[in-house]
UniProtKB/Swiss-Prot annotation:
Pfam family, one: MFS_1
Major location category of this protein: membrane
Protein localization: Cell inner membrane
Periplasmic side: 28-41, 93-94, 156-159, 230-237, 292-298
Cellular component GO terms, alphabetical: plasma membrane
Protein name: Purine nucleoside transporter
Positions in the Cytoplasmic compartment: 1-6, 63-71, 116-134, 181-208, 259-270, 320-340, 383-403
InterPro entries given in the database record: Efflux_drug-R_Bcr/CmlA, MFS, MFS_dom, MFS_trans_sf
Membrane topology: Multi-pass membrane protein
Keywords: Cell inner membrane, Cell membrane, Membrane, Transmembrane, Transmembrane helix, Transport
Family per record: Belongs to the major facilitator superfamily. Bcr/CmlA family.
Induction, as annotated: Induced in the presence of adenosine or adenine. Expression is controlled by the LysR-family activator PunR and the nitrogen assimilation regulatory protein Nac.
Catalytic activity reported: adenosine(in) = adenosine(out); 2'-deoxyadenosine(in) = 2'-deoxyadenosine(out); guanosine(in) = guanosine(out); inosine(in) = inosine(out)
Length: 403
């Protein structure tokens, strides 16, 4: 028997919690700085430390959830996050702020890993793509809405209210854990000893993860460079903020369009066409940099096409990466998310480093263009195992499992 709509809503809540924790407090940076009487760099460091903890701790929670079960590990992770959020109400200095933000990151990333594992645990394999396609657009929407919610709380209350809200949301998400029933899928102990190295030996896994990470890195490169690009073009901060709205809508269209398309076609049939759309849109965005006096609309049109492609690509490649490891999905999701965040961080770092050397638009779009090569490489990897190298790849994984 498949889970109902309430279970799906709960999974969606788990999926966006990490982004709420990341982005809701961004509008409060100045208020936190003034209240704690600390340098702006210390408040900014709280975000960097959070992202570092969020990326690294996933490698802990994933294997633990495979070994000890989703229920206890998720309960521990969310409890840690709730306590970290509650502690933020009494922060009096920058050091405590940094420590508690790291505690929050370690706790909340349990939800980021385990919600993906729960999808593969509780839904039949033929429906996993559609479930990811239903949830992932909300993941893309949350970074746009979280700062708006944070701003509203800041205007009407104080910056501490942001973390009180996160605490309340977490408590609501903790309660259903107590009613979480064990999965009915048969247990396969052969994957209990699967390591991260074993996962990377699978061309299907690393190919799909590379596609996921590269598409995300292209988006993060734009997020890093776009404020400089649009400021140089003469746009106000208000217009720059509004420029992210069509991108978010485009991502939603891609995600829910993919969900509808999956009722008629398989993910592996849709993927090559979506990757072509991604490549063409990125190349068009890069080419716009050579137009003299380029306008915001001329840049946003191809970029929004890329956002549509990403919204449709994500659920397909995530499902394809996790499917071969039904009893090691915690580890598989953890490594996938860490590699994705790592490549996004690298793309953002390169844009930040080069943006003072060349024009912001050309620098940013050139970094985006490099991700097309990585996407092509990822597709060739997973395609090779599908059509010609599958037996060899499976033999490698089987050999590693036997050891």
């Amino acid at each position: 028997m498949q889970p109902g709509k309430r279970f799906l809503v709960w999974l969606a809540g788990l999926s966006v919690l990490g982004f709420l924790a990341t982005d809701m407090y961004l509008p409060a940076f100045a208020a936190i700085q003034a209240d704690l009487q600390t340098p702006a760099s210390a408040v900014s460091a709280s975000l960097s430390l959070f992202l570092a903890g969020f990326a690294a701790a996933q490698l802990l929670w994933g294997p633990l959830s495979d070994r000890y079960g989703r229920k206890p590990v998720l309960l521990i992770g969310l409890t840690i996050f709730a306590l970290g959020s509650l502690g933020m109400l009494w922060v009096e200095n920058a050091a405590t702020l940094l420590v508690l933000r790291f505690v929050q990151a370690v706790g909340v990333c349990a939800a980021a890993v385990i919600w993906q594992a729960l999808v593969t645990d509780y839904y039949p394999s033929q429906k996993v793509n559609r479930i990811f396609a239903a949830i992932m657009p909300l993941v893309g929407l949350s970074p746009a809405l979280a700062p708006l919610l944070g701003s509203w709380l800041l205007v009407h209350f104080s910056w501490q209210a942001i973390f009180a809200t996160l605490f309340a949301i977490t408590v609501v998400l903790i309660l259903p854990i107590f009613w979480l029933k064990p999965t009915t899928k048969a247990r396969n102990n052969s994957q209990d000893g699967l390591t991260f190295t074993d996962l990377l030996r699978s061309k299907t896994y690393r190919g799909n993860v590379l596609i996921y990470a590269a598409c995300s890195a292209s988006f993060f490169a734009w997020l890093t460079g776009s404020p400089f690009i649009l400021s140089e073009m003469g746009y106000s901060p208000a217009v720059i903020g509004l420029s992210y709205v069509p991108q978010t809508i485009a991502f939603l269209i891609g995600g829910y369009g993919c969900r509808a398309a999956l009722q008629k076609w398989q993910g592996k049939q849709l993927l090559p066409w979506l990757l072509v759309l991604f490549a063409v849109s990125v190349i068009a965005t890069w080419a716009a940099g050579f137009i003299s006096h380029v306008s915001l609309v001329e840049i946003l049109i191809p970029f929004c096409v890329m956002a549509i492609a990403n919204g449709a690509i994500y659920p397909i490649v995530v499902a394809q990466a996790l499917r071969p490891f039904p009893h090691a999905t915690g580890r598989a999701a953890a490594l996938q998310n860490t590699l994705q965040l790592g490549l996004c961080f690298l793309a953002s770092l390169v844009v930040s480093w080069l943006i003072s050397i060349s024009t912001p638009l050309l620098t940013t779009t050139s970094v985006m263009l490099s991700t097309v090569v990585l996407v092509a490489l990822g597709y060739m990897m997973q395609r090779c195992e599908e059509v010609g190298c599958q037996n060899h790849g499976n033999a490698e994984v089987a050999h590693s499992e036997s050891h």
